[in-house]
A protein has these predicted regions:
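Catalytic machinery of carbohydrate-active enzymes
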Residues: 1-354
Length: 354
């Protein structure tokens, strides 16, 4: 019996699923429990190898530590965590917070070495460590960690997230699909990762002219305003109501394909094996992009990308020859590389190959 500690974020959680599939295939007797942030607790339950999901509320608890202590919520979590003695505890995240949770549980703790994780101090909580190069994609890094900790081999060319769609919450049913549909995943974290709003509106027009209905989800008030702006004046664009992860998974599963920025929901689309065009400006998809079949990454051709910065510091003229002398009509300028017409052409091409 193995405990996985991977508490967040959505993309990181989804990156762990292929390793769970590998282990299940190699070790038929294996059973996983999983500690995860309460907002993402639906995801592990979709995998048949995960027996128990243990929600943790670190994000919420940090906002009021005194209240958390007084209402005994942390003590209840600790009691559940320590209710089982695990054969192995794998910290698949490599942060101090995940290392602390790993040590708090009962079992031999495993993690990545201090030279190969984001917060090296986390290794103080481990009994044993393994080194996996930073140059590997996040999915491969977790797969290697699991295979070495549990002593099995896997085929790196075969990728299976193992999601059983019948386990996705049936109460989030969305009805029958009517015609062709594409999902726009426009919401993300950093300002620099946002594709220009005008581009989304133009892309929505192209999509509906091609006979597609466009579905636009949102998660925050700011994202809702952007979704409504994308849909403005176009009856074939539907701004979805507030959804659970299960609801979003159902919409993605039912669609013909997805167009996304660098966002956790893009990784969900990849896990559901849905054709997805992902747009990358300041980030590097080679290390943490959508991973799997039917995935296409459109990277910026600016030579300052990927800068991995939350604030754009571009001041020109350090650009590739293709854009030398351009003033850039969009912000951030790295997204000038891929406009709506090209994105739609690439999307249709991907659908044709899938």
């Amino acid at each position: 019996r193995v405990l996985i500690v991977k508490v967040s974020s959505l993309g990181d959680v989804i990156h762990t699923l292929p390793a769970v599939t590998d282990a299940q295939r190699a070790r038929k007797d294996i059973q996983f429990d999983w500690v995860i942030e309460e907002n993402f607790a639906e995801v592990p339950s979709w995998h048949p190898a995960v027996e128990n999901v243990i929600p943790v509320a670190l994000r919420r608890w940090r906002r009021n530590i005194f209240k958390t202590y007084m209402n005994h919520e942390f003590r209840a979590f600790k009691r559940e965590l320590q209710g089982v003695h695990y054969d192995l505890v794998i910290d698949a995240q490599g942060l101090i917070k995940s290392g602390f949770i790993s040590r708090l549980s009962k079992g031999l703790t495993i993690g990545l070495s201090n030279r190969t994780i984001r917060e090296p101090m986390a290794t103080l909580f481990y009994n044993k460590v393994y080194s996996v190069p930073w140059t590997e994609h996040a999915v491969d890094r977790v797969r290697q960690l699991f295979s070495r900790a549990l002593q099995y081999e896997y085929d790196p060319d075969e990728i299976d997230y193992g999601i059983d769609v019948s386990r996705i919450d049936a109460s989030s049913s969305i009805g029958e699909k009517a015609g062709k549909q594409v999902v726009f995943l426009h919401g993300t974290t950093w300002k620099t990762k946002h594709w220009p709003e005008d581009y989304w509106r133009h892309l929505a027009h192209i999509s509906t002219q091609a006979g597609y209905k466009v579905l636009v989800p949102w998660g925050t008030p700011e994202e809702k305003l952007r979704a409504e702006s994308i849909a403005q004046g176009n009856e074939r664009v539907e701004v979805l109501g507030k959804q659970t992860l299960s609801g979003l998974a159902n919409y993605i599963q039912q669609s013909d394909g997805v167009i996304a920025v660098d966002t956790g929901l893009g990784h969900l689309a990849a896990a559901l094996n849905k054709p997805t065009v992902s747009l990358y400006g300041p980030t590097n998809p080679g290390l943490s992009g959508t991973f799997g079949n039917n995935q296409l990454h459109l990277n910026s051709s600016l030579n300052c990308a990927p800068c991995v910065k939350k604030v754009c510091t571009y001041s020109g003229p350090g650009v590739t020859e293709e854009y030398a002398g351009s003033s850039f009509a969009v912000t951030p300028p790295c997204f000038a590389s891929h406009g709506p017409i090209e994105v739609w052409q690439q999307f249709e091409s991907l659908l044709g190959k899938s």
